[in-house]
Amino acid sequence: MIAIITGDIINSQNTDSELWLPKLKNLLGSWSATPENWEVYRGDEFQLKCSVDEVFSKSLMIKSLIKTFENLDVRLAIGIGNEVFLSEKITESNGSAYVNSGRLLNDIKIEGRTLAIKTENDKVNRDLNILFKWTSIDFDSWSVATAEIIHRLLINPELTQEELAKELNITQSSVSQRIKRSHFDLIQETDFFFRKKIAEL
C-alpha cells in the first residue's frame, strides 16, 4: 500500500512561478528522486509518492510552504491504495492509489475543497474527510507569518524558539505568539490521530 498526493497550486497564474516553484521542487527533492517518486507538470500541478503514515505530515509541509507566498494556496488530493505498474515516471505509473488521488483532485476542484483523502475503506474515508473539512478551515486561513512558523516546525520539530527567532529575524516573544496562534500542538495531535486511523486499513 502506498500514498499518492496529487496537487495543484491555486492562483499560480497571478504569482511569478520563479518565486515558489524552485522551493516546491527543493522540498519534494529532499524526500525522494524525480521523476520516479515526484514530478511537477503542466506548470502548476504535481504528484508525489510517499509512505502512507507520512502522507498527512508531508501534505502539511507542502501546504505551509505554499502559504508562505502571499495569495497562493494549494489543493491536495491524497490517494491510498496499491501500485500495479511502476514506471520510470510517477505520472506514468498506475494503481488504485494513483486513480484515487487523480480523480479526487478533480472532485475537490468542483467542490471548492483544498484537502481530501480517498482510500479503499469507506468508513476511513468518511472519518478522515470530516476531520479534513474542519482542519482546512484553519489551514486555509494561515497567514504568511503563521505558515512560516508551521513549515519550519514541521520540517524540524526540534527547533527552539530562540533558533526560530534568529531565522525569522523576529523576537522570541513574537515566535511564542505565532506558535500559539498556529495551534501547532493540535496539528501534531491531528497527525498522530491520522496515523492511528490509517493503520486501520
Identify what each model region corresponds to:
Residues M1-N106:
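DNA-contacting interfaces and partner/effector-binding or oligomerization modules
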Residues F85-E92, I108-I130:
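Flexible, glycine/charge-rich interdomain/linker segments that couple
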Residues R126-A145, K197-A199:
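Short, Lys/Arg-enriched anionic-surface-contact patches
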Residues E148-L153:
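Short alpha-helical "packing" element that flanks the helix-turn-helix/winged-helix DNA-binding module
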Residues N156-P157:
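Flexible coil/turn residues that form the inter-helical turn or adjacent wing/linker of helix-turn-helix
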Residues T160-L168, V175:
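Short alpha-helical "recognition helix" segments of helix-turn-helix
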Residues I179, L186:
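DNA major-groove recognition helix of helix-turn-helix
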Residues D191-L201:
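Short, basic, alpha-helical segments at the C-terminal edge of helix-turn-helix-like DNA-binding modules
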